[in-house]
A protein has these predicted regions:
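Aromatic- and carboxylate-lined catalytic core of secreted/periplasmic carbohydrate-active enzymes
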Residues: 4-8, 25, 358-361, 370-510, ...
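Short tyrosine-centred short linear motifs in exposed loops/low-complexity segments
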Residues: 11-14, 57-59, 63-81, 479-481, ...
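Extended acidic/polar, glycine-enriched regions
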Residues: 38, 47-113
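Extracellular beta-rich ligand/substrate-recognition surface
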Residues: 54, 473-478, 596-609, 658-665
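Active-site mouth of glycoside hydrolases
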Residues: 103, 108-331
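Catalytic-core region of carbohydrate-active enzymes that cleave or remodel glycosidic bonds
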Residues: 313-402
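Predominantly extracellular/luminal regions of secreted and cell-surface proteins
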Residues: 428-437, 553-593
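Aromatic, loop-rich ligand-recognition surfaces of beta-strand-rich domains
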Residues: 591-652, 666-708
Length: 708
């Protein structure tokens, strides 16, 4: 919405632009003049903001009212003789927000009164579930989409709609503001760049026609934008400090009135870049009249690191945007505990894990499929009230299998349209579902405190509420052992439930827990997989989904008599390959063509692939036979079923027991027998040892009873 500095009605938490026309011509309006405005509510509340040049003689001040009632404003221009920009006044009325998102109903995000987590303006707890989209303003496209079978023509909206459907609440990104990084993408994206004159004059058209459109879509859909302006020393080495200061002001002017949380830039905690990014952050703080939470994305560092200490001492710094990093090793409990106990600044600061073990990338080792899930659960039980997920192809916008964009072949082996479907993104949905259900803001991490448990191993973690009414634990050990919870209220009735991080469903443990001593000996885990546990005396948490746990039951190799081979519609983005000339092809047709000499071929064998089979109607599915390709390895796999693509049930899991492999005329076959009413069957074909592995499938035969 725009206002030509006249009386208009706007809604709280919604952006409106006050449009001004310069009365003077400037050689470079971006650099030659500055504009500010003060907005004053009828109750005396003031919000100070920067204005920005929007092309030609047009300048704007962007504002989102935070209270209903009458607001007035007055502008200040560095050129006081410019009567079109200086001393302009206006008044408007702000009405209630009629939208339906959490941001519409509860307001912008801020830090809680106890300094531990994020809340909306009205105090409603905000659960941070982020998705990593580094450099998206530059390189994610609004004018093309190469997801297999998609005709939307907008990669950004395709990604956004997917993440909204999965319950993500934060879009984590930064600008490649110097246009000096890009992972091989610079100069090849279809949209124009950020600069008309490199680092000297911004290109307002790019912001108006692309980036504002992106950020409007994010805000209007209820997404908080975790926003930085550049990347470590890459940006600061490429850009003069005065140019960085100017663009920091410009970006703050355009986007401070959005639902943002500032992360300054990626990895600022290094000698070459620290001072420059601190200056940038100070400019942001001075021009953000909303005082959005402000932090800075870090390297993987302990709290006593000299740069972390310096960061902690800055007036503008309010929360820690942690990076656990990547690779097979786990960040120890004590590192998170040190941030939890940190009082260097004299106040408590929240921290959130914003980069840890992106799914299916290689960095310090190959992360694989499960690492993201484990990192997320551990972080949440260790004081991070939320988590930012990242996945191959999406985190750095690798657009296609052709070319070298987004570090393809270096950090990522697959493009965005393969990464977006990874199983980890669904498991983030289940993570958030659990912590919202248990009232995450009431939980306190207990680390290795013997007063609350004997869970001292790095693979066993627990949090509990202050009143001892709720315990949440997580076990990612590879055996079935658990432990003892302590500090329960003696004589109080508790319920105990396992929670499956792979399905988002609970399984009752048994009878009510009543402890005379305040201790509860947790039963062995249902399986050797990772499991969460909820023990609570609360009865007001609401309804929950349950499941019968798949424990790796013994299988039969015999398909039931009367079962008929089906012809499902099959989709798999992990085998959709674009050639250098842009032509796409997929080998999914080979999966159910009845010909074992044709093979389905994944693009990156080291990564996981999801093969989705749609029967078009609910049927009693009886089993599946998978014929491996010639000389193919057998990776770990999991089979799941659903009647409607939500609420998946695990049907088979080779990580819990070995698959039964039979020879049949020179081909190796796996047969899994199960029974249930399903429309969709999902085969998660997990990672092979390396990308030279042959991980092909010659044929899939899915069996079901024919509906009468």
């Amino acid at each position: 919405m725009t206002m030509d500095h006249c009386t208009e009605n706007v809604q709280i938490w919604k952006r409106t632009d006050i449009v001004l026309t310069s009365g003077r011509e400037y050689t470079n309006p971006y650099a030659d003049v500055t504009l500010d405005a003060v907005f004053t509510h009828e109750d005396g509340t003031t919000i100070r903001l920067y204005g920005f040049w929007n092309g030609g003689n047009e300048f704007r001040v962007r504002f989102a009212p935070t209270k209903t009632g009458t607001w007035s404003y007055e502008t200040v221009c560095s050129d006081s003789e410019n009567t079109g920009l200086h001393g302009q006044k206006g008044k408007f009325f702000a009405a209630e927000n009629t939208g339906s998102t959490e941001l519409d109903r509860h307001g912008f995000v801020k830090i809680s009164d106890n300094g531990r987590f994020f809340v909306h303006e009205d105090g409603t707890p905000f659960y941070w579930l982020g998705d990593t989209n580094w450099q998206a303003p530059n390189y994610v496209s609004l004018t093309r989409c190469n997801y297999p079978g998609c005709t939307c023509g907008n990669q950004f909206l395709h990604e956004l709609n997917d993440r909204l459907a999965k319950g993500f609440t934060v879009y984590q990104t930064y600008f490649d503001i110097a246009e000096s990084d890009g992972g091989g993408q610079r100069g090849i994206t279809p949209e124009p760049g950020l600069w008309k004159i490199r680092h000297r004059q911004i290109n307002p058209q790019t912001f108006t026609e692309k980036i504002d459109v992106m950020f409007d879509a994010l805000a209007d859909s209820g997404m908080v934008i975790a926003l930085g302006y550049g990347v470590h020393s890459n940006t600061t080495a490429a850009m003069d400090i005065e140019d960085l200061k100017r663009v920091s002001r410009y970006l703050t002017a355009r986007y401070a009135s959005y639902p943002v949380v500032w992360i300054t830039a990626q990895e600022i905690t290094g000698e070459a870049q620290f001072a420059a990014w601190n200056v940038s952050a100070e400019i942001t703080a001075a021009g953000d009249g909303y005082h959005h939470p402000q932090g800075a994305h870090q390297f993987p560092l302990p709290v006593d690191n000299e740069y972390v200490a310096a960061l902690d001492g800055k007036d503008w710094h309010e929360f820690f945007a942690l990076q656990a990093g990547h690779g097979p090793s786990r960040i120890p409990k004590c590192l998170y505990e040190s941030y939890w106990n940190n009082r260097r600044s004299g106040r408590v600061k929240p921290f959130v894990e914003t980069e840890a073990n992106y799914e299916d990338i290689t960095c310090g080792g190959f992360n694989g499929y499960a690492a993201s899930r484990i990192a997320a659960w551990r972080a949440n039980l260790l004081g991070s009230y939320g988590f930012t997920y990242g996945v191959t192809g999406v985190w750095a916008n690798c657009y296609s299998t052709a070319g070298d964009t987004g570090w393809l072949g270096a950090y990522s082996f697959e493009p965005w349209y393969m990464g977006i479907d990874k199983p980890g993104s669904y498991e983030m949905t289940y993570l958030a579902k659990f912590f919202r259900y248990v009232d995450f803001s009431t939980l306190i991490p207990r680390f290795n405190d013997p007063a609350y448990s004997d869970l001292t191993e790095e693979t066993k973690l627990v949090s509990s509420s202050e009143d001892a009414g709720t315990y949440a634990a997580y076990f990612c050990n590879r055996d079935r052992s658990s432990g003892i919870l302590k500090g329960l209220v003696p004589g109080k009735e508790y319920s105990a439930k396992w929670y499956n991080p792979l399905t988002g469903k609970f399984a009752e443990i048994g009878n009510t827990v009543i402890s005379a001593t305040g201790q509860y000996t947790v039963p062995d885990k249902p399986t050797s997989a990772d499991w969460a546990l909820l023990v609570t005396c609360r009865t007001d948490l609401g309804a929950y989904e349950t499941e019968t746990i798949f424990c790796g039951e013994t299988i039969s190799a015999e398909i039931p008599a009367g079962a008929v081979v089906q012809k499902p519609e099959i989709t798999c983005s992990g085998s959709h390959i674009h050639t250098a000339d842009g032509v796409g092809y997929n080998t999914t047709d080979a999966l159910c063509d009845g010909d074992r000499t044709t093979e389905w071929i994944p693009f990156a064998p080291m990564a996981s692939q999801t093969i989705l089979m749609d029967l078009k109607q609910v049927k009693n599915v009886c089993g599946i036979r998978i014929t491996l390709g010639k000389n193919a390895v057998l990776p770990p796999y999991r089979l799941e079923g659903s009647s409607g693509q939500s609420g998946w049930t695990i049907l088979a899991d080779s990580t819990l027991r070995e698959a039964s492999v039979m020879e049949n005329n020179g081909f190796r076959e796996i047969t899994e027998i199960f029974s249930g009413e399903y429309r969709y069957i999902k085969l998660l074909w997990l990672g092979a040892e390396n990308n030279t592995s042959v991980k092909t499938i010659a044929e899939i035969a899915l069996y079901a009873e024919e509906n009468v």
